Amino acid sequence: MSLFEAIILGIAQGLTEFLPISSTAHLRIVPALAGWQDPGAAFTAIVQIGTLIAVLIYFFRDIVTISGAVIKGLMNASPLGTPDAKMGWMIAAGTIPIVVFGLLFKTEIETSLRSLYWISAALITLAIILSLAEWLIKKRIAKGIEPKSMSDIRWKEALIIGLVQSIALIPGSSRSGVTITGGLFMNLSRETAARFSFLLSLPAVFAAGIYQLYKSWDSLMASTNDLVNLIVATLVAGIVGYASIAFLITFLKQHSTAVFIIYRIALGLTILALIATGNVQA
């Protein structure tokens, strides 16, 4: 991998990690279109550490508040004593499903599921499901039903969204896409669904990144060029990712996810067309 490729892939990761359009899909598609080698699942997981740092910085106050409440609750023998402490434990519990399924299907995730056929199918399928969630929002608005805010999230919502997050193990589905969609089905506001999605991403993305970094450590140490490129891609992903978070939170306050639904369907169909015409290999 060249430095130029690392920068482009870092930008792709940062732009698409938080938008509901799948960063993994773009890290698979961009190299295929450019004629580069697939960077692999390990590269994807490690570069996500950059976007993890973006979440830590953007939601720094929320994270400090929640973490402090969890620690204080444990010290006072009242782990669920405050809403912030409860939020921390709900995030932890919501992370369990993706960890379990990730370990069970690790081989498939890193190999067969990275096929562009799977990616295009996931892009289109989630777009259809997300459009259904948007339709439900309109129905609720017509009935005068108010959407839920962060303070309204309960164990039911957290656990269901956490379970739904497991679908993100399929490349092309989008971790933020499936969790935001799950939140919308649970009547969270679009902004709240995005905020909870980003906070829920922290444990899973951190664990996946550290695991893949550990697995790849020897090969990275053996190649200074690969290590430098990975660091550059991670830094670029973090910077672009921060801007992407700010954009999406602001965007969803005023707009629906329609533009992302259209983009996902168009991209999925384009990939299938490129495969059919022999322009890219699945």
Curated annotation (Swiss-Prot):
Reaction it catalyzes: di-trans,octa-cis-undecaprenyl diphosphate + H2O = di-trans,octa-cis-undecaprenyl phosphate + phosphate + H(+)
Topology relative to the membrane: Multi-pass membrane protein
Subcellular location as annotated: Cell inner membrane
Keyword flag Kinase: no
Keywords on record: Antibiotic resistance, Cell inner membrane, Cell membrane, Cell shape, Cell wall biogenesis/degradation, Hydrolase, Membrane, Peptidoglycan synthesis, Transmembrane, Transmembrane helix
Keyword presence, Glycoprotein: no
Family according to the record: Belongs to the UppP family.
Protein name: Undecaprenyl-diphosphatase
Organism, scientific name: Prosthecochloris aestuarii (strain DSM 271 / SK 413)
Encoding gene, per UniProt annotation: uppP
